[in-house]
Amino acid sequence: MSDQTTPQFRNLLLEEQLCFALCRANRAITRTFGRRLEPMGLNHSQYLVMLALWEENGLSASRLAARVNLDPSSLTPILKRLEAMNLVRRVRPKDNQRTVLVRLTAAGRDLQPCTADIQRAVADATGLSGEDLAQLRAVLHKLADTLQKDEDRQTDVA
C-alpha cells in the first residue's frame, strides 16, 4: 500500500476533493450551456444576468451583481456587452443619479422564450432525472449558504 492510499492520506487524493468535483462540474455545465447559448450571442455569465432581469426587470446594478453573485466590477463589462447587443439599457433615475438601473429592452424581453429549449437540452445532457437535479440544486444552495454564513462569521471576527 502506497502512502497515498493509506487512510490518513486518502482524503488528500485529488479525486476525493469536494472543491475538485465542484470545479469539474462547474466547468462542464458552463461549457454545456455555452455551446447552446453561442448561437444567441450569449455566454454563460450574460445568460445569468438575463435570467435575473427576466425575473425582476429594472434592478440596480449593485443589486443585480449581488443577485448573480458577481463583484460589481465584474458585472460592468457584461452589461456593456449586453447593452451593445441591445438587450439591456442602463439608466440613472432623475431622483438618484448615483444609482444605475438595468432594464431589459424589447429585444431582451423577446429573447426569454428562446431559452426554454436551452434549459431542457442542458437538463437532458446531465443525464439526471428532474428529481435528482432538484435535489442537487438544493444541496448546492445549502452548501453555498452555509459557507457564506461561515465566511461572514470569520469576517466579523477579524
Annotated model-derived regions:
Residues 1-40, 134, 142, 147, ...:
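N-terminal leader segment of winged-helix/HTH proteins
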Residues 61-62, 73, 80, 100:
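Residues within helix-turn-helix
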Residues 21, 28, 48-49, 110:
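Pre-recognition alpha-helix immediately N-terminal to the DNA-recognition helix
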Residues 30, 80-138, 145-148:
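Charged, amphipathic alpha-helical coiled-coil/dimerization segments
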Residues 65:
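The alpha-helix within a helix-turn-helix
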Residues 23-26, 51-55, 116:
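Short, locally clustered residues in the helix-turn-helix/winged-helix DNA-binding domain
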